[in-house]
Amino acid sequence: YHPSRDMWDTFWVNDKVVLRTHTSPGQIWAMREYFPEPIRVILPGKCYRYEQITPRSEHQFYQVEGLTIGKNIRLTDLIGVMGEFARKMYGIERKIRIRGSYFPFTEPSIEIDMSCSCENKGCRLCKSTGWLEVAGAGMVHPVVLSNGGYDPEEWTGFAFGMGVERPALLKHNIDDIRYFYN
């Protein structure tokens, strides 16, 4: 059982089968496969969530999980990786914003927003805020590290889960995620 698998955002096929809501459970598989080595992996997968369908969210999406485990990995390393992703993907004009959040598998947890293609003029994609959330992230929770075989007194790490559709929307100035699936 994964701590974020709750009834309100999950598609249950039957009482024993659930569709994947995110790629985070892949962290444990990666840790158990690569222990005791440091890890830097990307884990892609298709995900499903019981969500309202809007210009910015769909019930199905592809997610990329990033996981780094090593000695002295810090939150600033995660923020640097996300900033570098934004610069490489969009150029130096794209801004990122970090907000505190909560996820049961990271501590502390953050959400990463990127400045919208509307250039703060307001649009339906960003709900006229000028920002679009693109990733949930944080430092890997000590319990998750332990479950993966890593001693949290020695090892630290960060993880992020990023859908591929929202960055594509920003890259190509598309104003509705539903164009990908409908």
Model-inferred region functions:
Residues Y1-N182:
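TRNA-recognition modules of translation machinery and tRNA-sensing kinases, especially anticodon-binding
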